[in-house]
Amino acid sequence: MKKLKLHGFNNLTKSLSFCIYDICYAKTAEERDGYIAYIDELYNANRLTEILSETCSIIGANILNIARQDYEPQGASVTILVSEEPVDPQLIDKTEHPGPLPEAVVAHLDKSHICVHTYPESHPEGGLCTFRADIEVSTCGVISPLKALNYLIHQLESDIVTIDYRVRGFTRDVNGMKHFIDHEINSIQNFMSDDMKSLYDMVDVNVYQENIFHTKMLLKEFDLKHYMFHTKPEDLTETERKEITAALWKEMREIYYGRNIPAV
């Protein structure tokens, strides 16, 4: 896309929001309580603050304020307000490619807020437990929050991810013409690294004329031992392993497709 010479500030708002899900099987009530306590501690407000603060570092933003809260009986929220920084337009990368990984860092952000909320959940029947984290990165200016996507998905490894990206508003060039998007994008997938894309089955639902992009991700490989909490698959009977595997896959597909699947 040809570089635009703008009249005043770039007034486009770019919002990236995604849900990540972690699924687990806990055989007993004690194990279910243990999983909820474990995941709640793993993603407590302090840990989430570290992840989001590193995100700000990656995109080169100044943190103005941090509001964080752990909730009872479970869950946490963190919101970070970020200030704009001077940006040299010549240094802005508007190409469609993956953002940095945790070990690679440099981009600039004009203005942003970043927030995350967590939702651990379980049910006494079936032994299935889920953990959901909702994350939103919203910016005003020349940089797309998609540059933070790769890092955040790597940090919050998950079984299912649903991602939404939208560009709102408009900005004007020096001739007064309105521009409703200032960068090229065909798919959110183009902002993910190859190793990330190789791990997931993905599908896009995009409304290009409205600058709305949606991608869903489902982990390809399934190893039962990674989904058991304090129980080893070898300690179960073959029938139990098959039943638990079927229940986990059904749960994951229902979340991925956003609808209940009738039992066959």
Swiss-Prot record:
<dbReference type="InterPro" id="IPR003826">
    <property type="entry name" value="AdoMetDC_fam_prok"/>
</dbReference>
<keyword id="KW-0704">Schiff base</keyword>
<keyword id="KW-0949">S-adenosyl-L-methionine</keyword>
<dbReference type="InterPro" id="IPR016067">
    <property type="entry name" value="S-AdoMet_deCO2ase_core"/>
</dbReference>
<dbReference type="GO" id="GO:0004014">
    <property type="term" value="F:adenosylmethionine decarboxylase activity"/>
</dbReference>
<comment type="pathway">
    <text>Amine and polyamine biosynthesis; S-adenosylmethioninamine biosynthesis; S-adenosylmethioninamine from S-adenosyl-L-methionine: step 1/1.</text>
</comment>
<dbReference type="InterPro" id="IPR009165">
    <property type="entry name" value="S-AdoMet_deCO2ase_bac"/>
</dbReference>
<keyword id="KW-0210">Decarboxylase</keyword>
<dbReference type="GO" id="GO:0008295">
    <property type="term" value="P:spermidine biosynthetic process"/>
</dbReference>
<feature type="active site" description="Proton acceptor; for processing activity">
    <location>
        <position position="117"/>
    </location>
</feature>
<feature type="active site" description="Proton donor; for catalytic activity">
    <location>
        <position position="140"/>
    </location>
</feature>
<keyword id="KW-0865">Zymogen</keyword>
<dbReference type="Pfam" id="PF02675">
    <property type="entry name" value="AdoMet_dc"/>
</dbReference>
<keyword id="KW-0745">Spermidine biosynthesis</keyword>
<keyword id="KW-0620">Polyamine biosynthesis</keyword>
<protein>
    <recommendedName>
        <fullName>S-adenosylmethionine decarboxylase proenzyme</fullName>
        <ecNumber>4.1.1.50</ecNumber>
    </recommendedName>
</protein>
<comment type="function">
    <text>Catalyzes the decarboxylation of S-adenosylmethionine to S-adenosylmethioninamine (dcAdoMet), the propylamine donor required for the synthesis of the polyamines spermine and spermidine from the diamine putrescine.</text>
</comment>
<keyword id="KW-0068">Autocatalytic cleavage</keyword>
<comment type="similarity">
    <text>Belongs to the prokaryotic AdoMetDC family. Type 2 subfamily.</text>
</comment>
<feature type="site" description="Cleavage (non-hydrolytic); by autolysis">
    <location>
        <begin position="111"/>
        <end position="112"/>
    </location>
</feature>
<comment type="subunit">
    <text>Heterooctamer of four alpha and four beta chains arranged as a tetramer of alpha/beta heterodimers.</text>
</comment>
<feature type="modified residue" description="Pyruvic acid (Ser); by autocatalysis">
    <location>
        <position position="112"/>
    </location>
</feature>
<keyword id="KW-0670">Pyruvate</keyword>
<dbReference type="GO" id="GO:0005829">
    <property type="term" value="C:cytosol"/>
</dbReference>
<feature type="active site" description="Schiff-base intermediate with substrate; via pyruvic acid">
    <location>
        <position position="112"/>
    </location>
</feature>
<keyword id="KW-0456">Lyase</keyword>
